[in-house]
Amino acid sequence: IYLLKKYLKTKIPSVNKKNITDLIDVVLEDLEKTKFINDKFYSNSKAKSLIHRGASINKIRNYLLTKGVKDKYIEETINQIKENNEDQDFFSAIKICKKKRIGPTRDENNRPLFYKKDLGILARSGFSFETSKKILDLNKEEYIKIISLL
């Protein structure tokens, strides 16, 4: 939208702002009618992508809100995620631990030293305290079993 405004201003300097915004509205309506712009599809596909990267449900919800997706579509997407996997946050937190080498992936001698730091990393990633604590309390054998299932 910004680029379209800039393009129209440079090519046609006599156009006023009202005409530009009207033109943009017409283009957006046309794209929505032809289903090139679809919030529901965007919400579902972006959520799948974020889950694959290990994002928490809270992080997915906040990301979609910042992108301007309607609350109705966000709730549908979140409910669909919860139906597919009841404890999605747990598995996403495991992926974060594997990627950042924290929690159960650390050496047993260093785990107590880094417990608070690891808890903070998981909290900033959007995981609840209970989920983070459950992940950090796993021993190495349980962690390896869970990773083999993913």
Model-based region annotation:
Residues 1-150:
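An alpha-helical, amphipathic repeat domain used for nucleic-acid recognition
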